[in-house]
């Protein structure tokens, strides 16, 4: 099949949408999600026709969900042939969506979307692209808005589908399905038809096939147009709230690797609308998208604010939210197993513990030390007070500690609680000890019992380097 460069009204209309939302710029490299159905075939043809105008590089991704058997295989072959005819790079992904949905506890629709966008992002990285184009149209917006209303939604749900969302663009978002069908017919383009779209087994299909036609017939209105107009108006309201949310996010949230945290009191002080958006934004920073994160999840996270420390909830896609003292943390689930270690400290010498770090220890005369404040990872001890073998170890039941500046002893567990050290981090904190007597909780505090005083003559120096 060959696509002509003849100009139709469709192309001008899509071009207006592209310019209105600043979707495409010169020299963009665009990864297109092409199923072979009417919408994606139309988008492929339109963007191919605009290829020269913007000097675009186009790449096609097709995902076989392994749901429709032989029909799905023919869809892939159809799209591959299109790409061959048009001399466009073709990338095929296959995933057993029913199995994945069951494994991840998602609907097939959610699992399918997850796999598709993962494939788009993977291809984007592979080809050095900067945009992802998907073929949602005006009817999809209306259907999504109605579906969200039926499920219960906020402002974001009433917008339906954004024309531009990060690096994702939707060139057909202002085009009705009937316009797409006419365009394909006029250009003699024959899409693949997924007959499950015409079965009223699913809620979205019922909305498309029954609810919208019924409302339009009974109330004599263009429901698709009205809902799309409402969505466009609310998009501007949403943009304002998002800008406000970003401002607050930058003020009170702290990103640390694969986790993000916020002070509980700072979050509580925000308006409820901003609080919910902040939670969604925190999840987005960890996961890269918010698909699958529903209203109930957000409320569960906010309820954590009034729960005891170490309270935790699971979120979709192996993300968790937990309260750590006065912080709310959202992060990828940690899979670390409990560690146990115990090594005799070499004096003098270097003691290495895999996954924990290195300990350099040596003894000097007190006259050789001119500064006892070298930071949290270098400590000085009265060597004459140390009786017995010194080890570096992980915590054990019965460990006791006399923190510097305190009389008497306390359980190590109580010290960890006082210092607000998260429970899951405690096994990884190395302890310098003599038997059950802690000499130094590395990175935190040394023992009062082994401090250097006016009678000290020999000093044990221990330097810790984290691995």
Swiss-Prot record:
One of its GO terms (cellular component) is cytoplasm. ATP binds at residues 35-40. It is found in: Cytoplasm. Pfam families: ATP_bind_3, TilS_C. The keyword Ligase applies. Keywords: ATP-binding, Cytoplasm, Ligase, Nucleotide-binding, tRNA processing. The keyword Oxidoreductase does not apply. SUPFAM superfamilies: Adenine nucleotide alpha hydrolases-like (SSF52402), MesJ substrate recognition domain-like (SSF82829), PheT/TilS domain (SSF56037). One of its GO terms (biological process) is tRNA modification. This is tRNA(Ile)-lysidine synthase. It comes from Caldanaerobacter subterraneus subsp. tengcongensis (strain DSM 15242 / JCM 11007 / NBRC 100824 / MB4) (Thermoanaerobacter tengcongensis).
């Amino acid at each position: 099949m060959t696509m002509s460069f003849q100009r139709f009204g469709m192309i001008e209309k899509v071009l207006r949408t592209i310019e209105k939302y600043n979707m495409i710029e010169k020299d963009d490299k665009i990864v297109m999600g092409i199923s072979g159905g009417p919408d994606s075939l139309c988008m492929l043809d339109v963007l191919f026709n605009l290829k020269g105008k913007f000097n675009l590089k186009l790449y096609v991704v097709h995902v076989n969900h392994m749901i429709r058997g032989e029909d799905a295989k023919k869809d892939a072959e159809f799209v591959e042939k299109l790409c061959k005819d048009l001399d466009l790079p073709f990338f095929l992904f296959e995933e057993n969506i029913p199995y994945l949905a069951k494994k991840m506890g998602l609907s097939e629709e959610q699992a399918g979307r997850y796999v598709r966008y993962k494939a788009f992002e993977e291809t984007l990285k592979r080809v050095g692209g900067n945009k992802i184009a998907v073929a949602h149209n005006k009817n999809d917006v209306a259907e999504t808005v109605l579906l969200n209303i039926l499920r219960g939604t906020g402002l974001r749900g009433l917008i339906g589908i954004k024309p531009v969302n990060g690096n994702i663009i939707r060139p057909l978002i202002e085009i009705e399905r009937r316009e797409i069908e006419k365009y394909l017919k006029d250009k003699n383009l024959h899409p693949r038809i997924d007959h499950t779209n015409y079965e009223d087994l699913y809620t979205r299909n019922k909305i498309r096939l029954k609810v919208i036609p019924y409302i339009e017939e009974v109330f004599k209105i263009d429901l698709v147009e009205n809902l799309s107009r409402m969505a466009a108006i609310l998009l501007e309201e949403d943009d304002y709230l998002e800008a406000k949310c970003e401002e607050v996010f930058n003020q009170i949230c702290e990103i640390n690797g694969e986790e993000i945290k916020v002070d509980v009191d700072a979050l509580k002080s925000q308006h409820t609308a901003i609080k919910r958006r902040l939670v969604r934004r925190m999840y987005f920073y960890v996961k890269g998208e918010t698909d699958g994160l529903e209203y109930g999840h957000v409320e569960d996270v906010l309820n954590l604010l009034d729960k005891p420390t170490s309270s935790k909830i699971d979120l979709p896609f192996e993300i968790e939210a937990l309260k750590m003292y006065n912080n709310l943390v959202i992060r990828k689930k940690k899979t670390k197993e409990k560690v146990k270690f115990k090594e005799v400290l070499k004096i003098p010498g270097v003691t290495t513990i895999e996954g924990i770090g290195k300990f350099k220890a040596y003894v000097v005369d007190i006259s050789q030390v001119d500064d006892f404040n070298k930071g949290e990872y270098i400590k000085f001890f009265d060597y004459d007070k140390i009786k017995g073998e010194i080890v570096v170890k992980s915590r054990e039941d019965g460990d006791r500690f006399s923190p510097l500046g305190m009389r008497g002893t306390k359980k190590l567990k109580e010290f960890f609680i006082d210092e607000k050290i998260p429970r899951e981090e405690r096994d990884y904190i190395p302890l310098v000890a003599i038997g059950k007597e802690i000499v130094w909780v590395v990175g935190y505090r040394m023992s009062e019992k082994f401090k250097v005083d006016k009678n000290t003559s020999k000093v044990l120096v221990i330097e810790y380097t984290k691995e």
